[in-house]
Amino acid sequence: MTTFTHINSQGEANMVDVSAKAETVREARAEAIVTMSKETLSMIVEGKHHKGDVFATARIAGIQAAKRTWELIPLCHPLLLSKVEVNLEPLLETNQVRIQSLCKLTGKTGVEMEALTAASVAALTIYDMCKAVQKDIVIEYVRLLEKSGGKSGHFIAEEK
């Protein structure tokens, strides 16, 4: 069985020592789904939201969040990300927004948490901007889609 890397032999939480690890190109993709009413989604897609461009704001928030993940998640390393991408896709048939993020770097540790944080904060930003018109927006299916470049190998999530 694989052990938790952030727990020492005394059961205490510690940041993993990556100093001896080789630098490799590492990449991770994550997603989040935001479900809302047809009216709220239409308002966003048609650009009629009184706070401005919801997707542009959520995209920038996700990018900023990825860069600051180490400040939010206690045992994450500060990383020099070489790429952060956040894409938002309206799914009109299900009244949802699919958020997909991509983080990439050449380094000693993975970027899964950065990708997950980017997708999560983009979703939270949509909620924040739309809560005045709809309080029961649902954020769900925040998950890692794919990661590559590390010792643990290439991971691809199963389709849901």
Curated annotation (Swiss-Prot):
The keyword Chaperone does not apply. GO terms for biological process: Mo-molybdopterin cofactor biosynthetic process. The active site is at D128. Gene3D superfamilies: Molybdopterin cofactor biosynthesis C (MoaC) domain. Keywords: Lyase, Molybdenum cofactor biosynthesis. It comes from the Bacteria. Belongs to the MoaC family. This is Cyclic pyranopterin monophosphate synthase.
